[in-house]
Amino acid sequence: MKIWTVLLISLTPSYLLAQNNLGPRLTALGSNGAAVTDIWSLQANPAGIILVTKATVSLNYTKHLFSDEISTQALVAVLPFKNNYVGASFQRYGFAEYSESKVGFAYSKTFGKKLSFGLNGNYHQLKITNYGSSTGFSVDVGALYKLNKNFTFGGFISNPTKQKFNSSEISAQISTSFNVGVSYYPSDKVLIATAVSKVLNQSVNVSLGLDYRIVDLLSLRGGLSTSPFKQYAGFGLDFRNFILDMATTYDANLGYAPQIALGYAF
């Protein structure tokens, strides 16, 4: 075990404990998932999966460059039927001596052409060498409202009941957050998204992102967030049924965290 890595995690948990992996597209938009529709909304606002028109799966890998050992792997899948949508997600973060895993199952439903609601149930597992493991459960609830072709408003709450890991050996809180946002489409090619998020016991975070579709095949993205200050950039390729997204996050304290996701719509 590398002692410095364990000490780093214990001393700076707000930076190193796993956050929901939003996939490269939402990450490149400033980790902006409150009012943006995407398959990776399963990891943010579950109501945001409503524009997935075909059974779709996406696999993601993130490398945290401040340590050669730490990485994140994630998988999401969505199956639409009529005005109902079901989804499943998996995420693992960590290294050999420390890991966090989460499995989620979501259900979303549209009501007319403007309103949708989503619910996501999560099973969490935390493992620390020499300390054992612990499990916990949480839920995410969210909603989207499409005002018109230009504006969409959204919001979601993660773990509103403040659930914790249930082991006496490991005392850890599953984070609770409140998130609201708006997406603005000035044209068919441009998306501007912003969100305000509050994780309990942390500062309010404001994020802003831009998605510009240059051609049908290629989109360029960028974003910012304030707490802590981070910069984001990425691109997406959409070719036939394949979807390739890449993004990187820059944090002044932790450096770069590039990620890639490959998806397929059946």
Question: What annotation goes with each model-predicted range?
Answer:
Residues 3-13:
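Sec-dependent N-terminal signal peptides
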Residues 17-266:
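Subset of outer-membrane beta-barrel
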